Amino acid sequence: MKVSEFDYELPSELIAQEPVEPRDASRLMVLHRKTQRIEHRIFREIIEYLEPGDLLVLNVSKVIPARLYARKKTGASIEILLIERLEEGIWKCLVRPGQKVKKGTELVIDEDLSAVCLGRGEDGTRILKFQPQDDRLIFEKGRTPLPPYIKNEVPLERYQTVYAKEEGSVAAPTAGLHFTPELIEKLKKKGVQFAEVVLHVGIGTFRPVKVEEVEKHKMHEEFYQVTKETIKKLRETRERGNRIVAVGTTTVRTLETIARLPEQEEYVGKTDLFIYPPFEFKLVDALITNFHLPRSTLLMLVAAFAGKDFVMEAYREAVKRRYRFFSFGDAMLIL
């Protein structure tokens, strides 16, 4: 399958530069897979589509302030993006410009914080040891790691879901940005159940698909965790005959990863599961997601879930109706 089949025309003014206030006032496109019908609603009206006993599964990973600005002793500016914590104060990072950072290169963030390059990781990353080795201090100095298509500085809390609690992502699981505490409360009152997973969104989010053939693309590994409590809720939902509703593509990848493993009480590991058409979904019955970049692995996942032709038609409709796209954009519910 060609990557070009997942391309579409998007006017740049439809790329949302800041989030909507309140969060649940964003638009919601509803896709009905059985009837191929499309509806246009507001996100807070999602409550009308969820039944008592349905299980909403949230990714509670929290975005870290992963972007840092440093200087070499020569005065050259270096941008650092924290990718993965190896141990306290030692991180796998992306650095720009990369050719200027070699083993032994010292980087100064400010008078309180510096780093030294211990060497190269795979895939062009660098291993940086910070001085002092204090993650709290590193986070204090860091900024929100916004995607390159967002030009405004946005406070970290607005690039964070209201339920985020497990630090580790370098990009937000954006489908969850539309939920407010009030909406969650209303859903609970209706009898909708909630469960949590963790998938720390990694650098794959920033990396474009560079191959021509979809099947040749390789995903980066990302850390995930599913607790006993969540496993129990998934099982009970299945037994009741209710739906498992994934909030976001990261939740889908976590659930479909464990669905392919031997049964365990709880799961923790790394996944590089790449979902593209055709794909047999074993756990996810419905999906809440944003509008994704052309040719992206996220769009391929959505196409696998709802059918490529239907999804590409929905995207053309979204452009025509001037929906807002990407991280701070509008949402889609696929039933």
Swiss-Prot record:
Pfam families: Queuosine_synth. One of its GO terms (molecular function) is S-adenosylmethionine:tRNA ribosyltransferase-isomerase activity. Its main location: cytoplasm. Its EC number is 2.4.99.17. SUPFAM superfamilies: QueA-like. Pathway: tRNA modification; tRNA-queuosine biosynthesis. GO terms for biological process: queuosine biosynthetic process; tRNA wobble guanine modification. It is found in: Cytoplasm. It comes from the Bacteria. Keywords: Cytoplasm, Queuosine biosynthesis, S-adenosyl-L-methionine, Transferase. The keyword Amino-acid biosynthesis does not apply. One of its GO terms (cellular component) is cytoplasm. It catalyses: 7-aminomethyl-7-carbaguanosine(34) in tRNA + S-adenosyl-L-methionine = epoxyqueuosine(34) in tRNA + adenine + L-methionine + 2 H(+). InterPro entries: QueA, QueA_dom1, QueA_dom2, QueA_sf. Transmembrane segments: none annotated. PANTHER family: S-ADENOSYLMETHIONINE:TRNA RIBOSYLTRANSFERASE-ISOMERASE. Transfers and isomerizes the ribose moiety from AdoMet to the 7-aminomethyl group of 7-deazaguanine (preQ1-tRNA) to give epoxyqueuosine (oQ-tRNA). Belongs to the QueA family. Monomer. This is S-adenosylmethionine:tRNA ribosyltransferase-isomerase. It comes from Thermotoga petrophila (strain ATCC BAA-488 / DSM 13995 / JCM 10881 / RKU-1). The gene is queA.
